Amino acid sequence: CDLQTILQVPTQVISLNGSLALSFGTGGSRGTCAFYQPQGRVLALAKNAGGGSLAHEWFHAFDHYIASKMFKNAAPVQFASRLWLQNQVTDKETMYSHQLNNWLSAAFAEIFLDAGAPSAFFLRARAFDAKSQRRYYALPEEMAARSFEQVLQRLPLQNRFLVDGTLAGPAFEAGLYPETARAERLACYWLSYFQQLGTALELKLGAV
């Protein structure tokens, strides 16, 4: 699939080691194209919909899956992005030491912080939530998923079913996606992470 090609990983990464279940035409709410359900690890796409939502929802699934691989204190339904931010506040050393985790940590720092203070990206999302009286866009897992999908849309390989609407439209105009410079740095962190993960897994499979 295009996501596998972009990330340069084997299929087991896309399926999250076979733990990710796909559901079509079930669940969700009115107007929802796609959603991820941590309980059961289900990625659901609405019938005749879901276009442009797959990368966003897949990252939610990845964010959930990787939490226990990245942090010692991960509960079953927690996201790595949220745990990373919580650990910055509590200053707890709970991240497993590994180069791949360092790439993810750098990406989360890019999303949430500017020189140790809340990032401009976060401040825009928080202001939008305050105006709409709804806490959603500034949630760590939502900021991370929007960042990931925009990084993918900026790449040469285009797939409007995978991602769409991150470079134009109301959400983009409202500043709910990363600035260009931030997105470019995130691309470096995330693509390096997945390329290194893919290489390590291919070597492991080749040794079997």
Task: Spell out what each predicted region is.
Residues 5, 9-208:
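Active-site-flanking segments in enzyme catalytic domains
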